[in-house]
Amino acid sequence: MYISALLNVESTILDFWHLLKPRIMYLVVFTAIAGMVAAPGSIHPFLALISLMCIALGSGSAGAINMWYDRDIDLVMERTKNRPIPSGRVFAESALEFGITIGILSVFIMAIAVNYISAALLAVSILFYVFVYTIWLKRRTPQNIVIGGAAGAFPPMIGWAVVTDSVSWESFILFLIIFMWTPPHFWALSLNRSEDYVKASIPMFNVIHGPKKTRKHILIYSILLVLTSLLPALFLKKSLFYLSMAIIEGCVFIWFAISVIRLKNHSSQKKMFSYSISYLFSLFASIIFCSIDLF
């Protein structure tokens, strides 16, 4: 009986953990670290840890509220039907309360322990994801991912503000990289999930404009992304190394985008989606390495 109770507690904790969309959270925290490391100045390690905790909680808050609001469409989509709310493992009201609570806590702690600018940016990113993307754009326009992608682009900007207590053109460049990355990344996935989006009545770009136009736009945004990714060389310490990495990784990204147009199949789109994740991690890892004099 005691073991059974422990297993139930563990299962509940895991369900609430999944509400936070942990895979997105890892990327959010990693890009925030890049913003902190690339920023001029320094911060006490304990404050840096507190900041990253707040950013992670803020990201999780947006994810939990998103799952609460999207519980109806999650239920009919193959990709999302096993999430905690549609599967019945977590009550919708509990998910909403959980999301709001950790969101408020994350912003409050950031404001008290770090600075008001980073707290304000964190609040804006949460509110943008919930109200602008989830509630307003997602079910209304095929540009949902393009505009809504701004929510996921804030973390390096927040990380920069944690250290500098300011927003600058350098941090905006880091924001812009993720903003340009989001459409080709997500459209590569949505091309393979068109039936899901049709069932859920979500006007994804590929559903409204068709796969041919979507693939062309994947290439367009990929080129814009690669061009944008070169800009951090203007302020990084090891700019030549970074530039080399950005060019090599960017050429591979464009090659995958061209493959999506040329092959027009599930496999090329899946590979594009998978590589786009590796690409962003690698690019921001290069930003970190080129900011701390490791070589």
Curated annotation (Swiss-Prot):
Q: Which UniProt keywords apply?
A: Cell membrane, Heme biosynthesis, Membrane, Transferase, Transmembrane, Transmembrane helix
The entry's function note states: Converts heme B (protoheme IX) to heme O by substitution of the vinyl group on carbon 2 of heme B porphyrin ring with a hydroxyethyl farnesyl side group.
Task: Tell me where it resides.
Answer: Cell membrane
Report the protein name in the record: Protoheme IX farnesyltransferase
Q: Which GO terms describe its cellular component?
A: plasma membrane
Concerning HAMAP family, the annotation shows:
CyoE_CtaB (MF_00154)
Catalytic reaction list: heme b + (2E,6E)-farnesyl diphosphate + H2O = Fe(II)-heme o + diphosphate
First-tier enzyme category under EC: transferase
Q: What is the lineage of its organism?
A: Bacteria, Pseudomonadati, Pseudomonadota, Alphaproteobacteria, Rickettsiales
